[in-house]
């Protein structure tokens, strides 16, 4: 017997893994997006999974967001996060040139090894520091938009985004764009001989 009530459409599941150096701001970004608050105390993350629903381009999407530890001692544990991933968000902090350098020297090689063919989104964090007083930050060391965009092109990311979790600027936009990319992506990271290329088309920054 058929029901006279229409069944609710099931959300589309997409998995996004968030990578980047320790203290880059990944967990703060996720807290603001999923819980609506900015943590005042830094607590290093070993591993955490967030589930958050989002509506993009007429589609209801269930995002599984995997927060990972950036410290070297967790490299093996982090490798377990990559299975069946649709998009990887690689993050760096605009006040840490090491974190941007590691996008290319550490994170890209790790992704290529564990999750070949996955779509990449590069995200600049702590962008509020660009407007901070000289007493708070050395502006000669701050990474500007053009440098971030150049890095995104170098790793063949399909999006380059900038945000401030502290001010809640660009946070929703970052995950909306990542979800949009994930919608059209195939899951990677199953060691199935996937295509090694990380992205096609031009960056939308």
From Swiss-Prot:
<keyword id="KW-0342">GTP-binding</keyword>
<dbReference type="Pfam" id="PF00071">
    <property type="entry name" value="Ras"/>
</dbReference>
<dbReference type="GO" id="GO:0019901">
    <property type="term" value="F:protein kinase binding"/>
</dbReference>
<keyword id="KW-1003">Cell membrane</keyword>
<dbReference type="GO" id="GO:0007264">
    <property type="term" value="P:small GTPase-mediated signal transduction"/>
</dbReference>
<dbReference type="GO" id="GO:0005634">
    <property type="term" value="C:nucleus"/>
</dbReference>
<dbReference type="GO" id="GO:0051301">
    <property type="term" value="P:cell division"/>
</dbReference>
<dbReference type="GO" id="GO:0007015">
    <property type="term" value="P:actin filament organization"/>
</dbReference>
<dbReference type="GO" id="GO:0017157">
    <property type="term" value="P:regulation of exocytosis"/>
</dbReference>
<keyword id="KW-0133">Cell shape</keyword>
<comment type="function">
    <text>Involved in controlling cell shape and septation. Regulates cell separation by modulating the function of the exocyst complex. Involved in post-Golgi vesicle transport. Involved in driving sexual development in a palmitoylation-dependent manner.</text>
</comment>
<keyword id="KW-0132">Cell division</keyword>
<comment type="subunit">
    <text>Interacts with for3.</text>
</comment>
<dbReference type="GO" id="GO:0032956">
    <property type="term" value="P:regulation of actin cytoskeleton organization"/>
</dbReference>
<dbReference type="GO" id="GO:0005525">
    <property type="term" value="F:GTP binding"/>
</dbReference>
<feature type="lipid moiety-binding region" description="S-geranylgeranyl cysteine">
    <location>
        <position position="202"/>
    </location>
</feature>
<feature type="propeptide" description="Removed in mature form">
    <location>
        <begin position="203"/>
        <end position="205"/>
    </location>
</feature>
<dbReference type="GO" id="GO:0008360">
    <property type="term" value="P:regulation of cell shape"/>
</dbReference>
<dbReference type="GO" id="GO:0032153">
    <property type="term" value="C:cell division site"/>
</dbReference>
<feature type="short sequence motif" description="Effector region">
    <location>
        <begin position="42"/>
        <end position="50"/>
    </location>
</feature>
<keyword id="KW-0547">Nucleotide-binding</keyword>
<dbReference type="GO" id="GO:0007165">
    <property type="term" value="P:signal transduction"/>
</dbReference>
<dbReference type="InterPro" id="IPR003578">
    <property type="entry name" value="Small_GTPase_Rho"/>
</dbReference>
<dbReference type="InterPro" id="IPR027417">
    <property type="entry name" value="P-loop_NTPase"/>
</dbReference>
<feature type="binding site">
    <location>
        <begin position="67"/>
        <end position="71"/>
    </location>
    <ligand>
        <name>GTP</name>
    </ligand>
</feature>
<feature type="binding site">
    <location>
        <begin position="125"/>
        <end position="128"/>
    </location>
    <ligand>
        <name>GTP</name>
    </ligand>
</feature>
<dbReference type="GO" id="GO:0007163">
    <property type="term" value="P:establishment or maintenance of cell polarity"/>
</dbReference>
<dbReference type="GO" id="GO:0005829">
    <property type="term" value="C:cytosol"/>
</dbReference>
<feature type="modified residue" description="Cysteine methyl ester">
    <location>
        <position position="202"/>
    </location>
</feature>
<dbReference type="InterPro" id="IPR005225">
    <property type="entry name" value="Small_GTP-bd"/>
</dbReference>
<dbReference type="GO" id="GO:0010590">
    <property type="term" value="P:regulation of septum digestion after cytokinesis"/>
</dbReference>
<comment type="similarity">
    <text>Belongs to the small GTPase superfamily. Rho family.</text>
</comment>
<keyword id="KW-0636">Prenylation</keyword>
<protein>
    <recommendedName>
        <fullName>GTP-binding protein rho3</fullName>
    </recommendedName>
</protein>
<dbReference type="GO" id="GO:0000226">
    <property type="term" value="P:microtubule cytoskeleton organization"/>
</dbReference>
<keyword id="KW-0472">Membrane</keyword>
<dbReference type="GO" id="GO:0030036">
    <property type="term" value="P:actin cytoskeleton organization"/>
</dbReference>
<dbReference type="InterPro" id="IPR001806">
    <property type="entry name" value="Small_GTPase"/>
</dbReference>
<keyword id="KW-0449">Lipoprotein</keyword>
<feature type="binding site">
    <location>
        <begin position="20"/>
        <end position="27"/>
    </location>
    <ligand>
        <name>GTP</name>
    </ligand>
</feature>
<keyword id="KW-0488">Methylation</keyword>
<keyword id="KW-0131">Cell cycle</keyword>
